[in-house]
């Protein structure tokens, strides 16, 4: 009886010590990550915002997560999601074709410019917006759902009170410091991206389609993805604008692990500053190290 009690006590004590000792590296690691992000930001000369959600345990790493950042083309995820949501009640919607005119062309239209005087389906426009960041495609999607205010209204339906889309392409990319137009916070975008890609914000087939399009993105190799192990699967949407604004938002599938949601926003004080995708890659490496 005494031996059994002693054994139970020993096991409990060992477990307690393990938990106590284990908690020290956890807190230390959190502080270490914050310090590394702060140092990355200092060296970059800009302002960095990061939000990571580990869906395995709902733990988060947050850095300037409630500050506003210009979304630039990361807002295309919300516009496409709004169209997908609409398609739930209109089954043939994605096959609907939209006319492309020369007057529609703006500063970046790698896919749409090939269809001038022709048409593209809403599915094709969605893929072009997400996978090639085509700005004509984005504008057509925004127009289809009723304008920027309607995209914002869709975000509100999802419970996102921070996202706001005020303009179309390319003016939504001005990213003027302190300008609230076309902005969100890393925390808000991370939660919304989780709801859209892993949650119940969209129907099963619509969610699967969004994820498929994001996995097929062609613009993100030097951003978040560059800071991750090669075996991890990434679906992302990049964005860039004035003031060297450089963004990427991603849903990530580590090998044999639960998915991660990662939002990285970066902007600089100089209007003509160069994009810094390397900063996003470094941030991704810092927050996922050890996972």
Swiss-Prot record:
Inhibited by the beta-lactamase-blocking agent clavulanic acid; in the TG1 strain. One of its GO terms (molecular function) is beta-lactamase activity. Changing residue 107 to D: Significantly reduces catalytic efficiency with respect to cefotaxime. Its EC number is 3.5.2.6. Changing residue 167 to H: Significantly reduces catalytic efficiency with respect to cefotaxime. The keyword ATP-binding does not apply. Changing residue 247 to D: Significantly reduces catalytic efficiency with respect to cefotaxime. Residues 1-28 form the signal peptide. The active site is at 73 (nucleophile), 169 (proton acceptor). Extended-spectrum beta-lactamase (ESBL) which confers resistance to penicillins, as well as first, second and third-generation cephalosporins. Has cefotaxime-hydrolyzing activity. Inactive against the cephamycin antibiotic, cefoxitin, or against the carbapenem, imipenem. Belongs to the class-A beta-lactamase family. This is Beta-lactamase CTX-M-1. The lineage of its organism: Bacteria, Pseudomonadati, Pseudomonadota, Gammaproteobacteria, Enterobacterales. The gene is bla.
